[in-house]
UniProtKB/Swiss-Prot annotation:
Functional note: Catalyzes the condensation of carbamoyl phosphate and aspartate to form carbamoyl aspartate and inorganic phosphate, the committed step in the de novo pyrimidine nucleotide biosynthesis pathway.
Gene3D superfamilies tied to this protein: Aspartate/ornithine carbamoyltransferase
Classification lineage: Bacteria, Pseudomonadati, Bacteroidota, Bacteroidia, Bacteroidales
Source taxon at top rank: Bacteria
Full protein name: Aspartate carbamoyltransferase catalytic subunit
Organism of provenance: Parabacteroides distasonis (strain ATCC 8503 / DSM 20701 / CIP 104284 / JCM 5825 / NCTC 11152)
Pathway connected to this protein: Pyrimidine metabolism; UMP biosynthesis via de novo pathway; (S)-dihydroorotate from bicarbonate: step 2/3
Quaternary structure note: Heterododecamer (2C3:3R2) of six catalytic PyrB chains organized as two trimers (C3), and six regulatory PyrI chains organized as three dimers (R2).
Enzyme class: transferase
GO annotations of cellular component type: cytosol
Protein family: Belongs to the aspartate/ornithine carbamoyltransferase superfamily. ATCase family.
PANTHER family according to UniProt: ASPARTATE CARBAMOYLTRANSFERASE, ORNITHINE CARBAMOYLTRANSFERASE, MITOCHONDRIAL
Catalytic activity line of the entry: carbamoyl phosphate + L-aspartate = N-carbamoyl-L-aspartate + phosphate + H(+)
Keyword check for Endoplasmic reticulum: no
Length: 306
């Protein structure tokens, strides 16, 4: 990568992506490599997180580093009015790496511009989630044996879903076909569709979630409707249960179909799907550890073969 920070997946070339995925595979084979001894990482989570924060902290610990940080911004000086710039500059005095989640779009990029310490974007509003994209790409390649020429169906909150926005960019190097399934209120934004058009990516939009669409699919990417992104709770109530994947909907699906979900789920995947061998979302979350270990080493310029 040209930058030592990872704030957006569009920083990564095809070669960058494949190198990070190859390194993630090496970490899956042996996650306990003491490559960060003597280094400290800060996890600054201004928004709630379970998987992303814990997997990043586990990644640092398994690499021999130490972690400081917070998961509740109300306990920090930002609750007293401290600016994001000042928070970043203060934390930069203590650490070698900052991993940050923030509700404002562009916050991670801004942080990377005010400090020389590498920044990893762990999610900025509805904008980007590049480390999730890497673990998604790792999961796709692991289950499909390839990344090229796959049909990916994205279902649910495509308007505010930063994971689907990032995944479109990450997959753009590999000639995918997309199906976007969403109610009109949560349809894929024009920015992402224009990106597809510019890069020659095929896509279709749907408001109905049907077995016919599922049967054309290699990767079924389910998402929850995010209550925290709505200012109108009546609108949220109207759309929150609009699509629910049930096990019987998979009866004629492709053998290679795998179901992904960035988690947490609410009601969009019925629990009877969990025992289907095509359900991969729990393993997908586990892959986050290896992908994030690879990302950390990438931004710090550490060779994992040392």
């Amino acid at each position: 990568m040209k930058s030592k920070s990872l704030v957006s997946i569009d920083q990564c070339s095809k070669e960058d992506i494949l190198r990070i995925l190859d390194n993630a595979r090496k970490f899956e084979e042996n996650p306990n490599r003491k490559l960060l001894e003597g280094k400290v990482a800060a996890t600054l989570f201004f928004e709630p997180s379970t998987r992303t924060r814990l997997s990043f902290e586990t990644a640092v610990n398994r690499l021999g580093g130490r972690v400081i940080g917070f998961s509740d911004a109300s306990t920090t000086s930002s609750s007293k009015g401290e600016t994001l710039k000042d928070t970043i500059l203060m934390v930069s005095n203590y650490v070698d790496l900052i991993i940050m989640r923030h509700h404002l779009e562009g916050a991670a990029r801004y942080a990377s511009e005010v400090t020389d310490v590498p920044i990893i974007n762990a999610g900025d509003g509805a904008n980007q989630h590049p480390s999730q994209t890497m673990l998604d790409l790792y999961s796709i390649r692991k289950t499909q044996g390839k990344l090229d020429n796959l049909t990916i169906t994205m279902v649910g909150d495509l308007k505010y879903g930063r994971t689907v926005h990032s995944l479109i960019v990450g997959m753009s190097h590999f000639h995918p076909t997309f199906h976007f399934v969403a109610p009109n209120e949560l349809r894929m934004p024009d920015e992402q569709k224009n990106f597809c058009d510019k890069h020659g990516l095929k896509y279709e939009e749907h408001t109905d979630f049907t077995e016919d669409i599922i049967n054309q699919t290699d990767i079924l990417y389910m998402t929850r409707v995010q209550r925290e992104r709505f200012t109108d709770l009546e609108e949220y109530e109207r759309v929150k249960n609009v699509y629910i994947l049930r096990n019987d909907m998979l009866r004629n699906s492709r053998e290679n179909l795998r179901i992904l979900h960035p988690l947490p789920r609410v009601n969009e995947i019925a629990y009877d799907v969990d025992d289907n061998p095509k359900a991969y979302y729990i393993q997908q979350a586990r892959n986050g550890l290896f992908a994030r270990q690879a990302i950390i080493c990438e931004v710090l310029g550490i060779s994992i073969d040392e």
